[in-house]
Amino acid sequence: MNYRKDFASQFGEDGIIEKIFDLLPAGDHWCVEFGAWDGKFCSNTNHLLSEKNWSGVLIEGNPKRINDLKNTYKNNPKVYPINKYVNFEGHDILDNILSPFPIPMDFDFLSIDIDGNDYHIWKSLAKYQPKLVLIEFNASIPGDIEFVQPADLSLQQGSSILSFVNLAKEKGYELICINQVNGFFVHQKYFELFGIKDNSIKALKHFKEPLQVFQLYDGTMVFHGTQSLYFYNTPVDLNKKLQVLPRFLRHSNFVWSNNQFYRFIFRIYKLFFLKKSKSSMNGDTEQNTWSWIREYKSFLNNKTAE
């Protein structure tokens, strides 16, 4: 992480990539990036293409941005701008998009950043084995959780770094670096060149503390760690916004007391405001709730009679 440097990249990727290729054996200097935007904004390949004389295939699905991308490299015949949305199945998989170009099967660098189906697109790549793969993960998901967003082009959720590590191992890659939002993976035959003794997520982690959740005996939910809407840069007080029980029910009287009044109030709230389930830890059901209502009516009648 000491090699972070930005020429066009967002979080020091340019410097990290430069150092990685200082250690990797010399290749054919080919790179692939999607979504490429205009070829400059937050680009992980612009420095290689503009300053290092690399060749590249840049893929951008947005029809408005593709003109800017073509304009950026209009005087560079070694860059091939493509207007396509990369898919994980069907005709527009990455293997098919790359096949018309003179790009080696083991080209040097693949950058994947589409804010969603990154996992499924890398998984679908079969013919090509780039030396280095940079891929965006959802940094709000803790490093010990495996989460893969559904394979759906209409969704933009992202997947966890652990999911990418597991996928990488299946495909013959090893993690060598993590920055704020990207994982860097090299083909396993080059891993020893980096002298990394421990490439676990915990050892390489350099991103903000992810959100953790736990609950207290009275039903209070506690949220610890980064509390903001990820892409909206909006702070959120989750300890106030995401409580299952209202404050008046988070009281020892409702937890421990055998008082019928307190238990009646809780069951009424549970019946009308909490999601119904077939059973709960104490065996309460909707039928039991109505049974408590009848019992409480009887209790009130007896009090009145007294």
Predicted regions and their residues:
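C-terminal non-catalytic accessory extensions
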Residues: I268-E306
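Hydrophobic transmembrane signal anchors and adjacent membrane-proximal interface regions, especially
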Residues: N2, L23, L229-F231, F254, ...
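Conserved acidic-Pro-Pro-aromatic motif
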Residues: N46-H47, W54-S55, D106-I112, G116-W256, ...
